[in-house]
Design a protein with these regions (language model features):
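Membrane-interface segments of envelope glycosyltransferases acting on lipid-linked substrates or membrane lipids
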Residues: 2-175
């Protein structure tokens, strides 16, 4: 049972292992959220077989886990299908490290127009290409807030001057 004032959050990440900073960030953040105030759904790939899964601890804490395909195209289709039937999220927190995340951000905006979309960069991967420059504009068009695991990660995925904007913050990979 969740009270009417509970905020609904969709967290989108890559998988349930704890091999990298992204997974550790997601695990630490979600284990420290008050699940009486925040109803969290984690949309995430399965844990790689050679890693320990964070699923048991997260589920025990009250996080709902939606396990999705590892294939990128199948994952995007699954996200679209989920958002078509779950339009009531207050916040969508999308961990991203790719150009394809920009149009996915646009899809999230269309399917959940009232949600605040937080995009979170975890990558600095030169060289900068024209496609990345276009992705910067798309992210900035559709997202409400921007996080980077560092300023360089924010600039790489969201644009050269994103850190000068008031809706950008650094969120280190440890909570």
């Amino acid at each position: 049972f969740f009270p009417e004032t509970t905020m609904k959050i969709l967290m989108i990440s890559n998988h349930l292992g704890v091999q990298s900073g992204v997974q550790r960030y997601v695990q630490n953040l979600l284990l420290h959220l008050d699940t009486a105030k925040y109803r969290v759904t984690l949309f995430v790939g399965q844990c790689p077989p050679d890693q320990a899964s964070t699923a048991p601890a997260l589920e025990a804490h009250g996080v709902e886990i939606l396990a999705v395909p590892d294939n990128k195209k199948d994952r995007i289709r699954a996200l679209a299908a989920h958002l078509r039937t779950h339009k009531d999220y207050d916040i969508i927190h999308y961990h991203t490290a790719s150009k394809i995340g920009a149009p996915v951000c646009g899809m999230m905006r269309v399917l959940c127009p009232r949600a605040k979309i937080v995009v979170h960069s975890h990558i600095v991967y030169p060289p900068m290409t024209l496609t990345w420059r276009a992705a910067h504009l798309v992210y900035q068009l559709f997202a409400d807030y921007f996080l980077g695991c560092g300023v360089a990660a924010g600039r790489f995925v969201f644009g050269d001057h994103i850190d000068a904007k008031p809706n950008f913050s650094v969120a280190c990979n440890a909570v």
